[in-house]
Amino acid sequence: MSTAGGLPRAVERARAAHCDTLQVYTRSSRQWRARPLPDGEIAEFRRLSEELDVRPVIAHASYLINLASPDDTLRRRSGAALGDELDRAETLGLLGVVLHPGSYTTTTEEEGLARKIGRAHV
């Protein structure tokens, strides 16, 4: 559901479309930097989700995240972005976060899985 105009608008759009659950991006899915969530927007989002009975709401993590990348810089950046996604989901009272954990690219599947698992325990 589109979050144009802010996250609370997505809840209103979901209810108008007769949806009783919702998946949103809490930030741009194609940029590393995320705008801060204003307290008023958080409060309105939580209030509308409850009031309009649009629950559960789930976030979808950024497509840039790649916890399996052999590139250390990308992997660190991905870990930080995932942490931010989880923090935003908690702040908004969301049920969870959908994540595509990434691709092992030029290495083996086993090496990529080892990096993902290692990152999950950080």
Stretch-by-stretch model annotation:
Residues 1-61, 65, 69-86:
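N-terminal pre-domain/capping segments
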Residues 67-119:
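Active-site acidic/histidine proton-transfer and metal-coordination neighborhood
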